[in-house]
Amino acid sequence: MTTPRVPTTFTRKVAGGVKTTTTGSSLPTNNTSTTTTTTTTAAKKLPNGCKISIKNSNLLTSTGLTDLDDIIGGGIPIGSILMIEEDINSSYYMFLLKYFLAEGVLQQQGVFFSSLIGIDPFEILNKLPARITKEEEIEADKNDTTNNINTNINTNNNNKQPTDELKIAWRYQQYVSNELSKQQQQQSASTIMNQTFCHSYDFTRKMNVQSMNPELIHTLSHDAQSQAEGTSPYRNLFLEIQNLVYKYNKEAAMNPDQTRVLRLCIQSFSSPLWSNDEEGVIEFLHALKGLLRSSVATCVISVPTYIYSGAFVKKIAHLCDTVVSINSFSGLGGETPEQFAEYLGLFNIRKIARLNTLSLSFHPDMLTFVFKMKRRKMCIETIHLPPESSRAGDSKPDNNDSNKNKSDQNNIVSKMKSGSGLLCGGGGGGSSNNNPLDF
């Protein structure tokens, strides 16, 4: 007597570690609800103020300034170092540091600030800008733009004929109205996408100190006694950072769903007021870079590169992942050309982060931008130069004035360093003969 054959049983593994069993005699059914529930897995929760880069899948956190996030690839990669080259003629770099710190406070992230140049860290933390909603920002920008339009129209009334006013001012008004509507649409769309990634700030108001969590605020100030004993400030700084990084890594390992990112901010790093030990600077950056690679922390440092040689600046820039610089027009000598009248200086990209890859996953369209300070915020914009010659039918400009304006533009940009060499893998502080507008 022949025994019936037992149907063959197959075991299949699906996502999430759930096993499903099928038999050779089973037939497909139309009930798909049971299969979909077993194959879906819950998405892993990201830390506050973070997102995944669509270019290289790195975990990013915001600098606090949307314009800066856009030009460096979406934000600062976790585990990287962002270096800001300070300007000898201004302190605009402090606005970037305050943006970075304020964003960390609002995102309930750990914030560490250190300045060994005689500045009390709490003095900086008490002057962080207050948060402003997107609606308030749009309304403020609209009012500022309207005031600028009225000022320009009143100025044109003294210099233009009535026919010119109707032809130019009316078209200008229509152009600005269209630009405002586009800007509002873009900002409303970005609000939905990035409502928890980057906030807007108003520098005319101060952040409420009581809103800060004392357990998440960490500082390190200059200790004159340790300096007298001969202890290196870089060693003390690294030990303090190392303890904080280990603390946040341990908390993230114990409770992954409540991971907090640690933001490290160091003002005027490697300044002579810290120490004259250049080897200590290189050793500190080596150790810091290795420490951050396996952590949930990111670091922003500002460096007064104008006091060091080009070779030493290249070493520092090589150990940092992202390098940007601010160069103000003040102190360059001569008058600022009319085309740059509303701007305060140039903002250059020296280096883009390359984490977990050998090549650049983000290629910026430009390396040189311009920045300006509005009443409430800082803006980084693309350079737009007007055409050299006027349109057909208009009065021809004087050749001498045209040549003078062109030479002024060339002179003012020739005094700024180009970052194209470092971006392609070279060192920092490019040759002064390079034109930063040669993209």
Curated annotation (Swiss-Prot):
PANTHER family: ELONGATOR COMPLEX PROTEIN 4, PAX6 NEIGHBOR PROTEIN PAXNEB
Residue spans of biased composition, Gly residues class: 422-431
Localisation: Cytoplasm; Nucleus
InterPro entries, per the entry: Elongator_complex_protein_4 (IPR008728), P-loop_NTPase (IPR027417)
Entry keyword Cytoplasm: yes
Cited function: Component of the elongator complex which is required for multiple tRNA modifications, including mcm5U (5-methoxycarbonylmethyl uridine), mcm5s2U (5-methoxycarbonylmethyl-2-thiouridine), and ncm5U (5-carbamoylmethyl uridine). The elongator complex catalyzes the formation of carboxymethyluridine in the wobble base at position 34 in tRNAs.
UniProt keywords, alphabetically: Cytoplasm, Nucleus, tRNA processing
Composition bias, Basic and acidic residues: 391-407
Pathway membership, UniProt: tRNA modification; 5-methoxycarbonylmethyl-2-thiouridine-tRNA biosynthesis
Protein name, per record: Elongator complex protein 4
Subunit structure: Component of the elongator complex.
Molecular function terms from GO: phosphorylase kinase regulator activity
One of the Pfam families matching this protein, by short name: PAXNEB
Top-rank taxon, per record: Eukaryota
Region annotation Disordered: where it falls in the sequence: 386-439
Family as reported in the entry's similarity comment: Belongs to the ELP4 family.
Organism of origin: Dictyostelium discoideum (Social amoeba)
Keyword Cytoplasm in annotation: yes
Gene Ontology biological process terms, A to Z: regulation of transcription by RNA polymerase II; tRNA wobble uridine modification
One Gene Ontology cellular component: elongator holoenzyme complex
